[in-house]
Amino acid sequence: MTRFAAPIAEQIWDMKYRLKAGDGTVLDTTVEDTWRRIARALAEPEADSAAWEDKFYSALEDFKFLPAGRIVAGAGTKRSVTLFNCFVMGTIPDSMGGIFDMLKEAALTMQQGGGIGYDFSTIRPKGADVKGVAADASGPLSFMDVWDAMCRTIMSAGSRRGAMMATMRCDHPDIEDFITAKSDPARLRNFNMSVLATDPFMEAVKTDGSWDLVFNGTVFKTVQARDLWNRIMRATYDYAEPGVIFIDRINAMNNLAYCETISATNPCGEQPLPPYGACLLGSINLARLVWYPFEEDKAHLCENSLDDLVATAVRMMDNVVDASRFPLEAQAQEAAAKRRIGLGVTGLADALAMVGVRYGSEEAARLTSRWLERIARAAYTASAHLAGEKGAFPLFDADAFLASGAMQSMDDEVRDLIREKGIRNALLTSIAPTGTISLFAGNVSSGIEPIFAHAYTRKVLQKDGSRTEEEVVDYAVQMWRDLKGDAPLPDHFVNAQTLAPEDHVRMQAAAQERVDSSISKTINVPEDISFEAFKDVYMQAYETGCKGCTTYRPNAVTGSVLSVSEGEAPDHVKGAEVAGGDVVYIAEPLDRPAALEGQTYKVKWPMSEHALYITINDVIIAGRRQPFEVFINSKNMEHFAWTVALTRMISAVFRRGGDVSFVVEELKAVFDPRGGAWMSGKYVPSILAAIGGVIERHMIAIGFIEGEGMGLKTDPQAQVVNMNETPGAACPNCGQFTLHMIEGCMTCSSCGYSKCG
């Protein structure tokens, strides 16, 4: 009997989390082996490790507690990897040497796969004097371009895809350039960007007051605060960036306000961190804790089980601090000094649906607040008991801690316990993006987001090269089907497309009240929302206590979300209508950089005395590696003319960008009337098919397409089923139109790809 609620869950486990040897030999035979591996590794610091291993295994079993993907993939593997998802890097000095020292640290961190966040407000503005060199400063945006190039280079070397967050204060003299930087579609593609909005700035926006842009006490320019706010809003309305972070609120509510100042976040925004701070993340799966789902007057979330699970999860995550490696020693020291963790939730929308409550309603906000308050109380209680057993975090100061942040709203029983025993972890709660692990857990709703699609189809590549369609159903919807058969879904089953923006904000605000760190959430707004109404969303987020706001409005720039009727392709994949004999260009060809990286493959065709040497060079576009050109060389002059023609044609197709995987399919479909050959135990029908196989292997190796089981980049006409949902943009990993903005990250519901990792 499988533990997986859906085939996609098992495939994601196999692809991302299952332990395998370097040669591909499977070491985790079952998902139980994966759970046991994690439990054993995280129980090692305990005096009674065997007993705690069993408790940790019980928490992991059936996907009740979901550690972040880094922990699932890396714990107990003996590999030199970090178990932390992301980092905020050190403060950037305003000097050339200091700036490039920070670039080196960023490269070393990203090389190990960690996403990074930086505040670029510390770099002097463009045009400022540079003493001693008789020159003007180039400004922080120019150095962000260097960081962006570094990220592309790290990815082109085969490392995990990069994610970076850049922040800038709302009073920095270069803030106007920062706001509009991503209106250039080719610039800063590897960055998420957010403006640090201070409380005085927000008050000046309300009163239409003036606003000074300053650096080191010097006023460079004065603008109207409302005009600057409108520029931020217009850029976000049109390009989905920059986001807005209410930085004074973050610092005022920080448990560690007495010993640190925060000016940056991790790439997805749920962890505001000090210099060298690190994200340690895990999620309670609320959907697994609902008893008597869909039974009127009986369905409820078992809060006693929740308390026990939270206590175990806190202990597990605390042990990760000691078990993990870190890219930099400064990161290890920061983690050890404060031992902050980010315990959150996933499956909230599913749990609400299972107890009969409509996501976004006042009742949903009330329940969300209640459940997260319960989690916070259980987490702080567990951490206090851990402190009594193992010691408080080194920078703990009882009076200062109890007067700060989350402690101001905590009940007296917990406060007294902390004063008596101390507390092991400085901060404990955070709502992180959970797109991939939520699919791993059976496609539960992600984080505190609404259900995005009740059901959809994806295409899966089979061993014989054919593709099958597979329905992927939301966890709660599938449970409804299992219990109620064909009965229609009740009205309280809503999705992200049917919710008003104020419903999203209401839920985020309800959650933020009980979360000591921050929340990664996307507020989906309709394409036709007016600019004034759009601005109101951000002001509502500020007024209701949110620590930040991220929206997604589909449009021609960000990627439209299109309705698809039965049997009809999305408009953007239909053939163009050609009037008369006009030539229609699919896309402008990409310019060739001066130098490209690639691979050369040797193919020995049995019917030829001489081998073919196939060179495929790649280019990085929008943070994604893709084939750009092909060359074929051989001593066999019989092949010369057609190989030149073939490679010129294939290269011309590649340079147009987009989905070029059809080249593989067309080549592999060619049969030679003289017969094919057996190569590596497989029949290949022609030398052209062999070339197609090489190109396919290369595309898989660079991550342009997926291998067997996870779907080739293919026919985009995947239909959304049941609730007439709408497909999203094309996924850069699997090519299916199931890429959506969820929790501040572009996440694919077909293969689990997430920009945030």
Sequence positions of predicted segments:
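Acidic/polar, glycine-rich intrinsically disordered N-terminal extensions of enzymes
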Residues: 1-83, 229-233, 539, 543, ...
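Active-site cavity-forming subdomains of large catalytic enzyme subunits
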Residues: 3, 84-303, 326-333, 379, ...
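Core structural elements
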Residues: 59-76, 170, 314-322, 334-356
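Conserved phosphate/anionic-ligand binding catalytic regions in large, soluble enzymes, centered on
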Residues: 75-83, 87, 95-119, 167-169, ...
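Terminal amphipathic helices with adjacent charged low-complexity linkers/tails
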Residues: 197, 256-263, 267-272, 341, ...
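Internal maturation/activation junctions in enzymes
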Residues: 216-218, 309-332, 336, 340, ...
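Catalytic alpha/beta core of large soluble enzyme barrels
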Residues: 270-272, 317-322, 404-405, 417-424, ...
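Short, Gly/Pro- and small/polar-rich lid/capping loops
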Residues: 415-417, 564-613, 718-727
